[in-house]
A protein has these predicted regions:
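Sec-dependent bacterial lipoprotein signal peptides
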Residues: 1-15
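Lipid interaction determinants
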Residues: 17-79, 83-149
Length: 149
């Protein structure tokens, strides 16, 4: 009986130490395609300032599909084939509809998301993947996880 209790206590101690070590490593986790695929994120911040969607308006978003297909909407709908390497997301040749939006912020967001995807955006996840941050030296966009299902 003592051997069983001693074994269980040792197992718990080893497990606790291993768990603590992995939590410390989460801050340095390099985001992978698997972390992003099949998720939809809605915009919450632009360059550190909170973004609120207008009443009855669609929330600007970015979604990652199978094989890193990227789609979303700011003012216009956009889409492209993403590639994630060493925590940097790129999508060359992003396609985008070209409608005019009366909201100047949404028009600027079209340019910002296009620039981030075309030139490469550093990708990070916070709060267990609930917050997605895309950034470069000019722009930081923060999104909140809001999956369709």
């Amino acid at each position: 009986m003592k051997k069983i209790l001693m074994s269980a206590a040792t197992l718990l101690l080893v497990t606790a130490c291993a768990s603590e070590g992995s939590e410390m490593n989460q801050g340095s986790h390099v985001v992978t395609a698997k972390d992003l695929q099949h998720h939809n994120y809605v915009l919450t911040e632009i360059d550190g300032k909170a973004y609120r969607t207008a009443k009855n308006a669609m929330s600007p978003n970015i979604a990652f599909g199978e094989k890193m297909n990227i789609s979303g909407e700011m003012c216009n709908n956009y889409f492209g084939q993403g590639e994630l390497k060493n925590g940097v997301l790129m999508a060359k040749g992003v396609g985008m509809t070209r409608k005019f939006c009366s909201d100047a912020t949404l028009n600027q967001l079209d340019q910002k998301i296009n620039q981030l995807l075309e030139n490469g955006a550093k990708v990070s996840l916070e709060d267990d993947g609930k917050n997605l941050i895309l950034s470069n030296d000019k722009t930081t966009l923060k999104f909140w996880l809001k999956d369709y299902m």
